[in-house]
A protein has these predicted regions:
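A glycine-rich phosphate-binding loop feature that marks nucleotide/adenosyl-phosphate handling sites
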Residues: 131-133, 231-235, 396-407, 451-462
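Terminal catalytic/cofactor-binding subdomain
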Residues: 10, 14-162, 169-175, 202-212, ...
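Loop-rich catalytic cores of soluble enzymes, especially ATP-dependent carboxylate-amine ligases
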Residues: 37-38, 146-167, 171, 179-346, ...
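Extended, compositionally biased alpha-helical segments that mediate assembly or anchoring
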Residues: 447, 451-545
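A generic structural motif
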Residues: 60-61, 96-105, 183-185, 359-368
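Substrate-recognition/cap regions that form aromatic- and gly/pro-loop-enriched pockets
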Residues: 345-347, 353-444
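Short conserved micro-motifs at the rims of enzyme active sites and ligand-binding pockets
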Residues: 67-70, 106, 139, 189-190, ...
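Histidine-centered divalent-metal-coordination microenvironment in nucleic-acid enzymes
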Residues: 55, 169-182, 352-359
Length: 545
C-alpha cells in the first residue's frame, strides 16, 4: 500500500471521547495532509463543489409579512431550479447550482437577488433569521405549489408542520451550505484504500465521518456566525425565561449568539427524543426510516384527513425525512424528485453534505459572505481528514449541550462547554481548533484564495465576543435606540436599494426570465399528467422503502 494509505479510514472500533481527537491535527490527519501535498493531489480537494440555499421572508414596504402569492415573474416555486419557497408562501428560497469556487457561488446568488429585487413590486426581503412582526399563526400563509399531486404533497407537508410546531417557528430563515469533494479526489483516495473497498462505500463512510466531526464542532460555527440574539416581541408575546426586554418591542438574550439555533428556534421535544445515528450510512438511513414509519400519538390526535382536508401527510414522528432537523445532513445526488431521500441514500450513497447552522448575516446583502464560506470549507476539509470515531450516547448528549450553550449564551465571559466528560472554556477550545485549521487553510490557499485569512479573521471574534455578528447586532440596536423591527426594516431598505442600483446583466436576466416562464409551463404540464388520486399518489410514494 502506497504512502497515504492511511487516508482511508473506515469506521473504527474505538469509542474514545472526541476530546482525544480534537487537540489540533491528529497524526493520522498529518499523513493525509502530507499525501494531499504530493504533486497533482493537493489541487484535487480545491476543486470541490459548493452551493448555497438561502431563505428570506418577503415583507411589505412597512416591514410586515407579505400576504401576496409567490410572484409569477419569479416562475413556479414547484419547478424552478433556483427560486422556490420554503414553509411559507412568503418565505423565498434562493438555490444556487454547485460551483467549483466560492466566488462563483456567491456571484450567482447575487445575480438571483438582483433579479428578484427588480420583481418584488415594492416589497423587501427581511435580512435577519428571526422574522418581522407576526401577530398570529394564521397570518403566515403556507406555501402553495398548484394542484399536481407533487405540489399538493408539498403543501400538505407544510400544513402538517404548522399543526405540529406552529407556523411562527417555520417562518425562521437560515442559510445552508452544500459541499462535496470532487470525483477526482475520491478516485485518488480509492487508489490508497484496501482493494476490496468499493468507491461508493469509501465515499459514504468518509462523508459520514465528516458529518460526525462537524457535529463535534458545530458549536464553533454557531458562536462565530450566529446573528440572532434578539427578536420582535410578536414572535414570542408571552416571553421566555431566557429572554429579557431590550425595549418595549424587542426581546433579547444578553449573551446569545443564535436564538434561531436555541430552544426558542427550531428545537422541539419530539425530535429531541430521536436518536438518528451518523455512525454509518446504514444506521442513519435506518433511524430515519423508523421515524417516518412510527406513529407519534400526539400527532395522531391532530388527524390526517379530516372533513375531506389533509392536515398532514401521516401521523408518524416524521411525515417525511426532510422534517428531521439537524445541523448537518448527508445528502444523495440530486436527481429523481419522486425518490425518497432514504431510498436514494441506500441506493446511491452520500454525494454531499448540507450544513444548516448558519443564520442570515444581516451585514451582507445576500446573507452570507466569502469569509464565511471559506472558513466553512476549511472546517469541512478538516473534518473529512481527521479521525472520526463513532459517537456514543454520552458524547451525543455533550454535542447537543454544546450547541445549545453556544446558541443561548456563547458570548458569556468564561463560558465552559462539556468536553470528554470534563469542561473546556469555549474561547480556549476555539483557539485550539483555529490552530488546527491553519494547516488545512494553507493547503487550500495555494491558489491564493484567502482561506488562511478567513480562518485568522475568526480570531478577533474569539478574543472579543463583541466582534461576533450577534455582538455587533446587539451593539447596533443599543446605539441606534431602535427596536429590532425598526432596525432590521432599515437594513432591508438599504439592501433593496443596493440591488436596484446594481448594473443589469442582460444575459443573466434573459436566462432567468426564460427559466421563470418555462417553470410555469412545466408546472402546468405536471398538473395535466397526473393519473392517480392524491391518496393513491401518497400510498405509492410511501410504499417504496
Amino acid at each position: 500500500m502506497a504512502n497515504g494509505a492511511e487516508a482511508y479510514n473506515g469506521p473504527p472500533a474505538s469509542t474514545k471521547h472526541a476530546a482525544e481527537h480534537w487537540t489540533g491535527i491528529t497524526t493520522l490527519t498529518k499523513v493525509r495532509l502530507d499525501w494531499l501535498r504530493e504533486p497533482g493531489i493537493g489541487s484535487l480537494v480545491r476543486r470541490g463543489l459548493r452551493g448555497v440555499e438561502k431563505e428570506s421572508l418577503r415583507v411589505t414596504p412597512d416591514g410586515r409579512l407579505s400576504r401576496r402569492p409567490h410572484p409569477a415573474a419569479l416562475g413556479s416555486a414547484l419547478t424552478h431550479p433556483y427560486l422556490t419557497t420554503d414553509y411559507s408562501e412568503a418565505l423565498l428560497e434562493f438555490v444556487t447550482p454547485p460551483h467549483p469556487a466560492n466566488w462563483q457561488t456567491l456571484g450567482f446568488l447575487s445575480d438571483l437577488h438582483a433579479f428578484v429585487h427588480r420583481r418584488l413590486d415594492g416589497e423587501r426581503l427581511w435580512p435577519c433569521s428571526m422574522p418581522c412582526v407576526i401577530n398570529a399563526n394564521e397570518e403566515i400563509p403556507i406555501a402553495r405549489y398548484g394542484s399536481s399531486n407533487l405540489g399538493m404533497m408539498k403543501t400538505v407537508y407544510r400544513r402538517g408542520l404548522g399543526y405540529r410546531y406552529g407556523r411562527a417557528m417555520q417562518a425562521i430563515a437560515g442559510v445552508h451550505f452544500n459541499y462535496s469533494p470532487p470525483s477526482a479526489f475520491w478516485e485518488a483516495l480509492r487508489e490508497r484504500a484496501p482493494s476490496d473497498v468499493p468507491l461508493e462505500r469509501l465515499k459514504s463512510e468518509r462523508m459520514m465521518a465528516l458529518a460526525r466531526n462537524y457535529r463535534r464542532l458545530s458549536w464553533l460555527v454557531i458562536y462565530l456566525f450566529g446573528a440572532s440574539p434578539a427578536l420582535c416581541k410578536s414572535f414570542r408575546p408571552d416571553g421566555h425565561p431566557l429572554l429579557s426586554e431590550l425595549d418595549p418591542a424587542t426581546w433579547y438574550a444578553p449573551y446569545a449568539t443564535s436564538l434561531r439555533m436555541s430552544d426558542i428556534g427550531y428545537r422541539n421535544s419530539t425530535q429531541a427524543r430521536l436518536c438518528i445515528s451518523l455512525n454509518s450510512i446504514d444506521e442513519y438511513v435506518s433511524g430515519l426510516a423508523r421515524a417516518v414509519s412510527t406513529v407519534e400519538p400526539s400527532y395522531a390526535q391532530i388527524g390526517v384527513e379530516v372533513d375531506g382536508e389533509y392536515r398532514q401527510l401521516n401521523a408518524n414522528i416524521l411525515q417525511i425525512e426532510n422534517e428531521y432537523y439537524s445541523s448537518i445532513r448527508p445528502k444523495p445526488a440530486k436527481g429523481n424528485t419522486s425518490e425518497r431521500p432514504t431510498v436514494a441514500l441506500r441506493r446511491h450513497g452520500v454525494e454531499y453534505v448540507e450544513i444548516r447552522t448558519l443564520d442570515l448575516n444581516p451585514s451582507d446583502p445576500v446573507g452570507v459572505n466569502q469569509n464565511q464560506l471559506r472558513f466553512l470549507e476549511t472546517l469541512l476539509v478538516h473534518c473529512l481528514l481527521a479521525d472520526s470515531p463513532p459517537i456514543g450516547a454520552d458524547e451525543q448528549r455533550e454535542i447537543d449541550a454544546r450547541d445549545l450553550a453556544a446558541a443561548r449564551e456563547g458570548r458569556r465571559p468564561g463560558l465552559e462547554l462539556p468536553r470528554g466528560g470534563s469542561k473546556a472554556e469555549l474561547a480556549a477550545w476555539a483557539r485550539e481548533v483555529l490552530d488546527g485549521l491553519h494547516e488545512v487553510a494553507e493547503l487550500l490557499d495555494e491558489a491564493g484564495e484567502g482561506y488562511v485569512a478567513a480562518v485568522e479573521a475568526q480570531r478577533e471574534a474569539v478574543d472579543d465576543p463583541a466582534a461576533t455578528p450577534s455582538g455587533r447586532l446587539l451593539d447596533a440596536l443599543r446605539a441606534s435606540g431602535e427596536s429590532f423591527f425598526e432596525h432590521v426594516r432599515g437594513i432591508a431598505d438599504r439592501h433593496h436599494e443596493y440591488f436596484l442600483a446594481l448594473p443589469v446583466d442582460a444575459a443573466r436576466e434573459a436566462e432567468l426570465d426564460a427559466l421563470a416562464a418555462s417553470s410555469l409551463d412545466e408546472q402546468v404540464a405536471l398538473e395535466k399528467s397526473d393519473t392517480l388520486s392524491f391518496a393513491e399518489y401518497l400510498a405509492r410514494y410511501f410504499s417504496v422503502v
